Protein backbone atom coordinates (compact mmCIF):
# COMPACT_ATOMS: atom_id res chain seq x y z
CA UNK A 1 0.00 0.00 0.00
CA UNK A 2 1.41 3.34 -1.06
CA UNK A 3 1.75 5.84 1.79
CA UNK A 4 2.50 8.86 -0.36
CA UNK A 5 0.91 9.61 -3.70
CA UNK A 6 3.39 9.67 -6.53
CA UNK A 7 3.40 12.93 -8.43
CA UNK A 8 3.95 14.42 -11.85
CA UNK A 9 5.53 17.81 -12.46
CA UNK A 10 2.04 19.25 -13.01
CA UNK A 11 1.11 18.25 -9.42
CA UNK A 12 3.90 20.33 -7.86
CA UNK A 13 3.31 23.69 -6.23
CA UNK A 14 5.53 26.67 -7.06
CA UNK A 15 8.10 25.98 -4.32
CA UNK A 16 8.31 22.27 -5.17
CA UNK A 17 8.62 23.06 -8.89
CA UNK A 18 11.51 25.45 -8.21
CA UNK A 19 13.45 22.77 -6.27
CA UNK A 20 12.52 20.14 -8.88
CA UNK A 21 13.90 22.32 -11.66
CA UNK A 22 17.13 22.99 -9.73
CA UNK A 23 17.68 19.24 -9.35
CA UNK A 24 16.88 18.48 -13.00
CA UNK A 25 19.21 21.23 -14.26
CA UNK A 26 22.05 19.92 -12.07
CA UNK A 27 24.35 16.94 -12.60
CA UNK A 28 21.66 14.42 -11.56
CA UNK A 29 19.42 15.38 -14.47
CA UNK A 30 16.30 13.85 -12.91
CA UNK A 31 14.40 13.48 -9.67
CA UNK A 32 14.52 9.81 -8.62
CA UNK A 33 14.63 7.71 -5.47
CA UNK A 34 14.61 9.54 -2.15
CA UNK A 35 14.50 12.92 -3.90
CA UNK A 36 10.96 12.16 -5.06
CA UNK A 37 9.86 11.59 -1.46
CA UNK A 38 11.79 14.54 -0.08
CA UNK A 39 10.13 16.84 -2.60
CA UNK A 40 6.94 16.55 -0.53
CA UNK A 41 8.82 18.96 1.76
CA UNK A 42 10.64 21.31 -0.64
CA UNK A 43 12.82 22.87 2.06
CA UNK A 44 14.08 19.41 3.05
CA UNK A 45 14.50 18.42 -0.60
CA UNK A 46 16.59 21.50 -1.37
CA UNK A 47 18.98 20.99 1.54
CA UNK A 48 19.18 17.20 1.20
CA UNK A 49 19.89 17.36 -2.51
CA UNK A 50 22.61 19.97 -1.95
CA UNK A 51 24.31 17.75 0.64
CA UNK A 52 23.94 14.72 -1.63
CA UNK A 53 25.24 16.61 -4.66
CA UNK A 54 28.28 17.76 -2.71
CA UNK A 55 28.99 14.24 -1.42
CA UNK A 56 28.61 12.77 -4.90
CA UNK A 57 30.03 15.47 -7.17
CA UNK A 58 31.93 17.94 -5.00
CA UNK A 59 34.66 15.82 -3.43
CA UNK A 60 38.21 15.15 -4.57
CA UNK A 61 37.30 11.54 -5.45
CA UNK A 62 37.09 10.68 -9.12
CA UNK A 63 33.73 9.37 -10.33
CA UNK A 64 34.67 5.70 -10.15
CA UNK A 65 35.75 5.94 -6.50
CA UNK A 66 32.70 8.01 -5.65
CA UNK A 67 30.38 5.40 -7.16
CA UNK A 68 32.31 2.62 -5.39
CA UNK A 69 31.78 4.41 -2.07
CA UNK A 70 28.08 4.84 -2.83
CA UNK A 71 27.45 1.21 -3.73
CA UNK A 72 29.53 -0.04 -0.80
CA UNK A 73 27.54 2.12 1.60
CA UNK A 74 24.30 1.08 -0.09
CA UNK A 75 25.22 -2.58 0.28
CA UNK A 76 26.24 -2.26 3.94
CA UNK A 77 22.95 -0.54 4.79
CA UNK A 78 20.86 -2.78 2.49
CA UNK A 79 19.68 0.22 0.48
CA UNK A 80 18.01 -1.33 -2.54
CA UNK A 81 17.73 1.99 -4.39
CA UNK A 82 21.38 2.96 -3.93
CA UNK A 83 22.53 -0.46 -5.07
CA UNK A 84 20.19 -0.74 -8.06
CA UNK A 85 20.68 2.85 -9.22
CA UNK A 86 24.43 3.19 -8.68
CA UNK A 87 25.79 -0.31 -9.45
CA UNK A 88 25.28 0.15 -13.23
CA UNK A 89 26.96 3.57 -13.00
CA UNK A 90 29.90 2.08 -11.10
CA UNK A 91 30.27 -0.74 -13.64
CA UNK A 92 30.22 1.73 -16.52
CA UNK A 93 33.21 3.55 -14.98
CA UNK A 94 35.43 0.47 -14.65
CA UNK A 95 38.16 0.48 -17.26
CA UNK A 96 39.29 -3.13 -17.65
Language-model regions, residue ranges each:
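Mid-length scaffold segments of soluble, non-membrane domains
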Residues: 78-83
Amino acid sequence: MQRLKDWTVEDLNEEQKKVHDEIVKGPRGSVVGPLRIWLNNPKLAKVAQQVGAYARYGTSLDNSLSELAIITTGRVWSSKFEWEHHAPLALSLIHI
